């Protein structure tokens, strides 16, 4: 399948550069995955579309301030490091810029020596294995010295780093935020609970592969990056109870979707406690096994994320919805507006 089938025209001014002042004031497009019907709403209207007995699945990963600026100890040359994945102990898989300056044995100093890293291995596309040394607690030092690793299409400085975290972020480990969750406030989540909507939490640590473009000409040639996920016994039991009682499982974001669909795929359609690495790739033709609805932001043209949404709601429906979003001047990408995709015609809104 040609990746150009997932292209659409997006004016640059529709790429949201900063978050809205209030999280829940973003707009919400409601898309019926079967009929393609569209409604234009505000995010707080999600209350009308979720019902008692439904369950929202939220990714409680927390973004690390994973971008570090340091200097080479021998020359003083500036080096930028992006933490991707913790390996064993203090060894990390990272991206460095400029990569040609960092070879095995290179020592980089951050924060006037508060944190040091030695290159212990090299990989393609600027990848480097670094081993860190420090006094104290690594994540406290990272919190002091690191910056939030905003996506490459965001050029503005983020004034408040909490705005690139969900209000329920808990498990540190992501290089990017699960952005569909950024629209929820604690008050909105409380109102949903009062209505009888269940909240379930999983963890998937988002990797930088999220922003890597599909370089192959056809979808089938593309290989997904692997990301770590975890679902507890408590969450699995809740989701199975919701299903047994006829409720809907609504994932908040593509990361929650990938987690549930990975587990269901690996366990004959069943949801159970599990953890591991997933490189699941969902595109048209994929049959969903776990979810009934999806809340997600508006994604990049030709990205694996728009392919996932197209697998769930039909490519023609999704591209029509995206073209409507452009016409109606919705805000796109990480700090943009949201879409709620489900079989709304069957449920109506209450």
Swiss-Prot record:
Gene Ontology biological-process annotations: queuosine biosynthetic process; tRNA wobble guanine modification
Highest taxon of source: Bacteria
Listed EC numbers: 2.4.99.17
Subcellular location as annotated: Cytoplasm
Keywords tagged on the record: Cytoplasm, Queuosine biosynthesis, S-adenosyl-L-methionine, Transferase
Catalytic activity: 7-aminomethyl-7-carbaguanosine(34) in tRNA + S-adenosyl-L-methionine = epoxyqueuosine(34) in tRNA + adenine + L-methionine + 2 H(+)
GO molecular function: S-adenosylmethionine:tRNA ribosyltransferase-isomerase activity
Pathways involved: tRNA modification; tRNA-queuosine biosynthesis
EC supergroup of this enzyme: transferase
GO CC field: cytoplasm
SUPFAM superfamilies: QueA-like
Function: Transfers and isomerizes the ribose moiety from AdoMet to the 7-aminomethyl group of 7-deazaguanine (preQ1-tRNA) to give epoxyqueuosine (oQ-tRNA).
Family the UniProt entry places it in: Belongs to the QueA family.
NCBIfam families per record: PRK00147.1, queA
Subunit note: Monomer.
Name of the molecule in the record: S-adenosylmethionine:tRNA ribosyltransferase-isomerase
Organism of provenance: Bacillus anthracis
Gene responsible for this protein: queA
């Amino acid at each position: 399948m040609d990746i150009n089938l997932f292209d659409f025209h997006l004016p640059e001014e529709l790429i949201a550069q900063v978050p809205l002042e209030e999280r829940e004031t973003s707009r919400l497009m409601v898309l019926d995955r079967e009929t393609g019907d569209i409604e234009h709403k505000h995010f707080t209207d999600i209350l009308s579309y979720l019902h008692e007995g439904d369950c929202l699945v939220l990714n409680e990963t927390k973004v690390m301030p994973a971008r570090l600026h340091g200097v080479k100890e021998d020359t003083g040359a500036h080096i930028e490091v992006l933490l991707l994945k913790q390996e064993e102990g203090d060894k990390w898989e990272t991206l460095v810029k400029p990569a040609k300056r960092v070879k095995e044995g290179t020592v980089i100093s951050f924060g006037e020596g508060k944190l040091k890293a030695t290159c212990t291995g090299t990989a393609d596309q600027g990848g480097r294995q670094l081993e860190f040394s420090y006094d104290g607690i690594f994540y406290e030092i990272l919190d002091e010295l690191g910056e939030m690793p905003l996506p490459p299409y965001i050029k503005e400085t983020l004034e408040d780093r909490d705005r690139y975290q969900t209000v329920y972020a808990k498990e540190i480990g992501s290089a990017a935020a699960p952005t569909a969750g950024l629209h929820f406030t604690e008050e909105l989540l409380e109102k949903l609970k009062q209505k009888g909507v269940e909240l379930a939490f999983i963890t998937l640590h988002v990797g930088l592969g999220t922003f890597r473009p599909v370089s192959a000409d056809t979808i089938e040639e593309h290989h997904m990056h692997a990301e770590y996920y975890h679902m507890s016994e408590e969450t699995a039991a809740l989701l199975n109870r919701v299903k047994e009682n006829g409720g809907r499982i609504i994932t908040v974001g593509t990361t929650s979707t990938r987690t549930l669909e990975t587990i269901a795929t690996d366990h004959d359609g069943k949801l159970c406690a599990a953890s591991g690495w997933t490189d699941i790739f969902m595109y048209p033709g994929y049959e969903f096994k776990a979810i009934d609805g999806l809340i997600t932001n508006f994604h990049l043209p030709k990205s694996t994320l728009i392919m996932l949404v197209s697998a769930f709601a039909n490519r023609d429906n999704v591209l029509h919805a995206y073209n409507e979003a452009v016409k109606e001047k919705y805000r796109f990408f990480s700090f943009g507006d949201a879409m709620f995709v489900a079989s709304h015609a069957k449920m109506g809104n209450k």
